[in-house]
Structures are given as structure tokens and as C-alpha cells.
Curated annotation (Swiss-Prot):
This is Thioredoxin. NCBIfam families: thioredoxin. The keyword Electron transport applies. The lineage of its organism: Bacteria, Pseudomonadati, Pseudomonadota, Alphaproteobacteria, Rhodobacterales. GO terms for biological process: cell redox homeostasis. Participates in various redox reactions through the reversible oxidation of its active center dithiol to a disulfide and catalyzes dithiol-disulfide exchange reactions. GO terms for cellular component: cytosol. The keyword Transmembrane helix does not apply.
Length: 106
């Protein structure tokens, strides 16, 4: 499974009502650090397939979801479990650090 694009319209269905924990990556095309972590998140989405869903929200095209969560900088990662935020992280990080962060929140 690869990362799933999510919009403001699909946020509740894909994230808050998900049966599995969800990592939400708030990003933008122009954001260098966002592009840096993209490949790592793609790999992690395959490694965690069936256990964790990783979704991407483009903040330029979908401003409501990041505003609702108070996102001020990107990349901003939020981990949802049972529809609630259990952890968040701002800024780029290597794949190993992202994997540790995801695992610690499960």
C-alpha cells in the first residue's frame, strides 16, 4: 500500500473514522523538507500495510484540515488512533526516526 491523498472533504472518513491508526502528513509542493520525507513515508506505508495508514494532505489545496489542528509549520505529522490525535511531529526526520515515532505511538 502506498500513501493516500486526502482532502478536506475526505479527512473525517479517511482519518477520524479509520479502523487502523493513521499518520497524516501535512505538506506542500514547494516545501523542500516535505519532499525529503516523502520517499521515507512511501516506504513506511508499505512496511506498515494493514497496521497503519499513511495519508498526505496538501495544505495549499486543503487549508481547513491543517487549520483545525493548528498546523503552523510543515512538514507536520499527526498520528491518529481511534479518531484522536495521539502524537504529532513537526519537521523532516530520517526514515528510522519516523519508524520509531510511529511504533512508539502504537
Amino acid at each position: 500500500m502506498s500513501t493516500v491523498p486526502v482532502t478536506d472533504a475526505t479527512f473525517d472518513t479517511e482519518v477520524r473514522k479509520s479502523d487502523v491508526p493513521v499518520v497524516v502528513d501535512f505538506w506542500a509542493e514547494w516545501c523542500g523538507p516535505c519532499r525529503q520525507i516523502g520517499p521515507a513515508l512511501e516506504e513506511l506505508s508499505k512496511e506498515y500495510a494493514g497496521k497503519v495508514k499513511i495519508v498526505k494532505v496538501n495544505v495549499d489545496e486543503n487549508p481547513e484540515s491543517p487549520a483545525m489542528l493548528g498546523v503552523r509549520g510543515i512538514p507536520a505529522l499527526f498520528l491518529f488512533k481511534n479518531g484522536q490525535v495521539v502524537s504529532n511531529k513537526v519537521g523532516a526526520a530520517p526514515k528510522a526516526a519516523l519508524a520509531t515515532w510511529i511504533a512508539s505511538a502504537l
